[in-house]
């Protein structure tokens, strides 16, 4: 019975290949390579690296926004625009 349950919940190799292909299409470096297939291990490492770089970029943008807001009059039209964008 447990083998039935695990076989129903398992993902087919075709589904895994499709997911890997979709993941590859999301990475900027993979798009430049075109149709070349990277190994799954390399693709996952590139994905982790890309996610880390996105985190750093978000942190940097957050710091820049904080600096910008700190130097602004909180009642100014510019501050109101920024607040509305963040909602």
UniProtKB/Swiss-Prot annotation:
Expressed in which tissues: Expressed in phloem of leaf blades and sheaths, lamina joints, filaments before anthesis, vasculare bundles of the ovule, lemma and palea, and embryos.
Stretches assigned to coiled coil: none
Source species, domain of life: Eukaryota
Major subcellular location class: cytoplasm
Domain bHLH: 1-54
One CC-aspect GO term: cytoplasm
Family matches, as Gene3D superfamilies: Helix-loop-helix DNA-binding domain (4.10.280.10)
Compartment(s): Cytoplasm
Pfam families reported for this sequence: bHLH_ILI
Function: Atypical and probable non DNA-binding bHLH transcription factor that acts as a positive regulator of brassinosteroid (BR) response. Controls lamina inclination by participating in two BR signaling pathways involving BRI1 and RGA1. Involved in the RLI1-dependent modulation of leaf inclination by promoting lamina joint cell elongation, especially in response to phosphate (Pi) availability.
Name this polypeptide is given: Transcription factor ILI4
Organism of this sequence: Oryza sativa subsp. japonica (Rice)
